[in-house]
Amino acid sequence: MYTRIISTGTYLPEKVLTNDELEKIVNTSDDWIRSRTGIESRHIAADGEFTSHLAEKAAYKALEAAGLVPADIDLIVVGTCTPDRMFPNVACLLQERMGITGPAFSLEAACSGFVYALTVADQFLCSGKSKRALVIGAETMSRLIDWTDRETCVLFGDGAGAVILEASDKPGLLYSDLGADGQHRKLLYTETGLSNMESSVEGHLKMKGNEVFKVAVRTLESICLLYTSPSPRD
């Protein structure tokens, strides 16, 4: 049994924050941001617009593109680290609004959240537990941003992307590899927590961008070499 992506959907909030506008907030410039990231602007969720709202709009676009209705879905998996609330999770909020039945849960894996969600959904379908999954990556990162920190505020925005993943007799989703390395936890994190009783601390995102980039490149390189087995000549 295989799985394949049969449609996609996206949603970006209406508000756009350009590099020129950021120049008025923090010590940066359009040239500095473009040369290091390629980013020209980012979208920002409106007041009262939450992660579940972004996810829902992307989900309906994916359904429309596939010619399906919510009742055709029997699994929802969402990757997000900016949920509306601790619980119910974003997937369950979508389930209630869209009238979908079956398993519904969210995964917290930061930047790799959608990849984790897609891989888990793939395993559900390959095992025969589900037939058609709605998989979403959605974030409202602007709620975590310190707009005086140019290491982070220039990089992140808000948005959602969704795919419909379907069981198939032919290969579609070919391969995925999940991993984590907790020793780098201080390279990208937020202080705010619940069980650690630090919920009163400002929850701004903190990141050592150069180090995150180095770790990501090394890890991706090693995975590619491991699973493609290139020759020395390659």
Which residues make up each language-model segment?
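Short, well-ordered amphipathic alpha-helical segments that serve as non-catalytic structural scaffolds
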Residues: S29, T51-A66, V90, A216-L226
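Condensing-enzyme catalytic core mediating Claisen C-C bond formation in acyl metabolism
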Residues: M1-D47, D149-K214, R218, S222
